[in-house]
């Protein structure tokens, strides 16, 4: 029965309800949207785009960036694929950074610094892996055998 008219629900209404439910269930959750947005901050040209389009002049947007700091907590950050986005999120808390990121040279410098950091981290990981592979395995003796 329909709550509004005390009439039985038609097949068409059932179908429409099912379609509506499927649509609602297919939409991303707030958590998913925020995860995607926070990770998009690792894209420096996108951050520059936000500056060029005056997002950083909107107090509501600045408050939103502050709210997103919860992603720095381990229970949330473990879901990040691009953890450097947290570094950018932290930088965006600073008004001077928000003003400077609109500058193309500043943006390029930041991108170059990030690439150097990635390369350095990759080299460090390669060296650590090589050291692990070259470690001598201690000889294990079982019950007095050689």
From Swiss-Prot:
Signal peptide: none annotated. GO terms for molecular function: transcription coactivator activity. PANTHER family: MEDIATOR OF RNA POLYMERASE II TRANSCRIPTION SUBUNIT 31. Component of the Mediator complex, a coactivator involved in the regulated transcription of nearly all RNA polymerase II-dependent genes. Mediator functions as a bridge to convey information from gene-specific regulatory proteins to the basal RNA polymerase II transcription machinery. Mediator is recruited to promoters by direct interactions with regulatory proteins and serves as a scaffold for the assembly of a functional preinitiation complex with RNA polymerase II and the general transcription factors. Keywords: Activator, Nucleus, Transcription, Transcription regulation. It is found in: Nucleus. GO terms for cellular component: core mediator complex; mediator complex. Belongs to the Mediator complex subunit 31 family. Disulfide bonds: none annotated. Component of the Mediator complex. One of its GO terms (biological process) is regulation of transcription by RNA polymerase II. Residues 121-146 are annotated as: Disordered. The keyword Glycoprotein does not apply. This is Mediator of RNA polymerase II transcription subunit 31. Pfam families: Med31. Residues 126-139 have a biased composition (Basic and acidic residues).
């Amino acid at each position: 029965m329909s709550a509004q008219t005390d009439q039985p629900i038609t097949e068409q209404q059932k179908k429409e309800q099912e379609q509506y439910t499927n649509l609602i269930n297919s939409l991303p959750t707030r958590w998913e949207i925020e995860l995607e947005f926070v990770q998009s901050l690792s894209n420096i040209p996108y951050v520059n785009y936000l500056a060029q389009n005056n997002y950083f002049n909107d107090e509501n947007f600045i408050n939103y960036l502050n709210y997103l700091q919860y992603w720095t907590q381990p229970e949330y950050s473990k879901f990040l694929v691009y953890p450097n986005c947290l570094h950018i999120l932290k930088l965006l808390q600073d008004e001077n950074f928000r003003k400077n990121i609109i500058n193309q040279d500043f943006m390029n410098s930041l991108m170059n610094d990030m690439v150097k950091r990635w390369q350095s981290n990759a080299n460090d990981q390669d060296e650590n892996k090589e050291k692990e592979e070259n470690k001598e395995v201690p000889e294990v003796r079982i019950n007095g055998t050689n």
